[in-house]
Curated annotation (Swiss-Prot):
Superkingdom of origin organism: Eukaryota
The protein's name in its UniProt record: Spore wall protein 12
Any Gene Ontology CC annotation: spore wall
UniProt source species: Encephalitozoon cuniculi (strain GB-M1) (Microsporidian parasite)
Locations listed in the record: Spore wall
InterPro entries: AH/BAR_dom_sf, BAR_dom-cont
Gene name for this UniProt entry: SWP12
Length: 236
């Protein structure tokens, strides 16, 4: 075990046993607020990921949909006769419309059935397009998880330097020139590392991070609902 590792362990134990009141080394402006927000966003990544996954799969429903699948005569082509497919709710509605379109070729029900079928088949396709966009955001969340690991290491470094510097400044030992020089170096490193960590946390929170993911998810859902509404307007 090298000296730095031993020092890190000793510092970690000391920080846990003795709560330090930082009177000599304040955090840089905005750091504390950004860190609090960052930790909340970081700890919510799974919730966001789960909500996106739900948006991607809700159309497959639960027991009601499974019951509908078992009762429907899903024959859309000769090649599919006798085959079972796990249709989504939009495809299932489209197939219902297709069945109605076969009842009396000249009837108004037939025409409505065709329009109904087309609308829901189109919506099913739009849903796949939305899912493709949402899949990109799930990948982004995975990247953010990796990014958070790097940020946490930098936050730990900030915490360690701050502790060492606070102890150095509070030391009652006479300051030799080398000690003053070391203290100045530590202070410079603390400020530089803090700025780097703050920048990365703000990026994680902002449009390049979690906020951007939420915006993209909302945009994908909006596009889907707008296209779906337009398709349904044709069923008259």
């Amino acid at each position: 075990m090298d000296k730095e590792t031993v020092k890190d362990i000793q510092r970690s134990i000391a920080m846990k046993l003795n709560r330090v009141e930082y009177t000599e080394v304040p955090l840089i402006e905005g750091y504390s607020e950004a860190e609090d927000c960052y930790k909340r966003f970081r700890d919510s990544l799974k919730k966001i990921s789960d909500s996106i996954t739900w948006l991607m799969t809700y159309e497959y429903g639960g027991s009601k949909m499974k019951s509908l699948y078992s009762k429907m005569t899903m024959i859309t082509s000769t090649s599919r006769i006798g085959q079972f497919k796990n249709y989504d709710i939009y495809e299932a509605n489209g197939l219902i419309g297709l069945e109605f379109s076969k009842i009396g070729v000249a009837s108004s029900l037939s025409d409505t059935g065709k329009k109904y079928s087309k609308a829901y088949m189109d919506i099913s396709r739009y849903k796949l397009e939305m899912n493709s966009r949402l899949e990109q955001q799930l990948k982004k969340i995975s990247d953010l998880r990796d990014h958070s690991n790097a940020i946490d290491k930098k936050r730990k470094k900030v915490s360690n330097i701050r502790y060492d510097l606070e102890m150095e400044k509070k030391s009652k030992e006479p300051k030799t020139p080398s000690m003053v020089s070391r203290e100045n170096d530590m202070e410079r490193t603390f400020k530089e590392t803090s700025k780097e960590a703050l920048k990365e946390m703000e990026r994680f929170i902002g449009n390049d991070g979690v906020s951007g993911v939420l915006q993209k998810v909302a945009e994908a859902h909006r596009m889907f609902t707008e296209k779906s509404a337009k398709a349904l307007e044709e069923v008259k």
